Amino acid sequence: FKNMKLSNKYIAFASVALLMASCDLDKFPEGDYISEEQKEDIINGRPNLITAEVNAMAAKLNTFGTISDDATTYHNDYGIPAVSMILESGGQDLVALVNGYNWFNTSQNYSDRVYDSSSDELIWKTFYNHLKAANNVLKLIAADTEDSSLKVYRGQALAARAYDYLNLVQIYQFTYAGHENAPAVPIVLETTEPDVLSNNPRASVKEVYDLIEKDLVQAHSDLSSYQRLNSTYIDQTVISGLLARMYLLKE
């Protein structure tokens, strides 16, 4: 019985010690958490580790669940391919029956041309989520880096962001000529502070196109010596195509 009382005292003491330790919230997280500063230090020491952030950009292009949740599932919620179908269905050369499981029928009859349509939500969130992934990469790499691997990653992120804005500016405003000062879409950069995001008005068409051109020209320079493994990676040929498309749209 005496030994049991002693054991209970040890258990009580250990419980109090654990409780006190769990209440100490003033210490910096160690072990289980990695701060942004720690991540940046790691990447600067081992540039190859940033590939996870770069791969996230590609993953955002065809992800499921951008607008779906536990209450509602949209079967046309599968990223850029779905966005392409929405845009094609709004044209005159794609014919499909407006019944059954045609998830793009609202685009065919133009009833999705309202701000609260699921198609509009999918387009907006798909491009801005992909854009955020690109900004995450740019946030970790200094603009003046001389590291060859980091320059490639930065160039690919700049090209990805330009791709997003090139699509957004066409969808949410008329073409460039004659509409240079018309409101287009909000510009979000890697340097944009969180408190600005909730009060970030639409930039003009000219401002968006200027950013697209700036990003693509810099990306073209960053990828000057890059040889991609296959067509899933962004290289100078991709950027040249985007530049040509942008200049054509400005005419």
Residue map of PLM features:
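Membrane-proximal, proline-rich intrinsically disordered regions
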Residues: 6, 23-82
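TPR/Sel1-like alpha-solenoid repeat signature
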Residues: 158, 240-246
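Sec-dependent bacterial lipoprotein signal peptides
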Residues: 1-21
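Short coil/linker segments at helix-helix boundaries
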Residues: 171-210
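Conserved, well-structured interaction surfaces
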Residues: 96-172, 203, 220-226
